[in-house]
């Protein structure tokens, strides 16, 4: 369509060696685990570059993986190289801290939001809207609709939500709109100002 599209996802997404990626994931997931309640859950999004390492580290650290959501973007960015299929999905792992402790899942609301049918693990939602992107410059910002669904599915009003990679704080905005408490962390100062 003649539009210029940025495909830079940020310095942190460039990875490094598999060993470096694994070590990084182990460290931050272990830190999050320490702060989760016994029946707490964690949601982690990523692309194929990182998500398999994340899944392995979650399992090694004692989490029980509940679902791997496939976020099928209804408006993916174009495939500029034309050498492979257009990349239109991201994966979101939902896991609970303790395999034997029950977690909260708002099954009825998820069913209601899905025309009274069980919600599947494939979520067809658009990528970030232009109006949302105007609120921040984070290259991997997630859409408000995605974070809203995650929060509604797995927390009760008043619950604490931690986002250790807060970026432009879409998670915080969704948490606030839904009556949850929020703590966001980001190592990049430009996103905290």
Model segments located where?
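Core catalytic lobe of class I
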Residues: 1-192
């Amino acid at each position: 369509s003649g539009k210029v599209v940025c495909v830079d996802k940020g310095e942190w997404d460039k990875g490094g060696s598999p060993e470096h990626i694994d070590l990084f994931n182990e460290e931050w997931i272990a830190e999050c685990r320490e702060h989760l309640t016994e029946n707490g859950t964690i949601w982690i999004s990523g692309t194929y570059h990182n998500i398999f390492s994340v899944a392995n580290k979650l399992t090694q650290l004692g989490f029980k993986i509940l679902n791997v959501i496939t976020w099928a973007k209804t408006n993916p960015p174009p495939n500029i190289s034309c050498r492979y299929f257009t990349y239109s999905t991201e994966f979101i792992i939902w896991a609970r801290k303790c395999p034997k402790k029950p977690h909260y899942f708002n099954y009825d609301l998820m069913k209601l939001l899905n025309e009274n049918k069980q919600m599947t693990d494939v979520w067809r939602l658009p990528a970030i809207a232009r109006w949302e992107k105007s609120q921040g410059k984070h290259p991997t910002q997630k859409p408000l609709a995605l974070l809203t669904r995650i929060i509604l599915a797995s927390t009760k009003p008043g619950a604490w939500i931690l986002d250790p990679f807060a970026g432009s704080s879409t998670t915080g905005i969704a948490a606030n709109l839904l009556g949850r408490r929020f703590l966001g962390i980001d190592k990049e100062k430009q996103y905290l100002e």
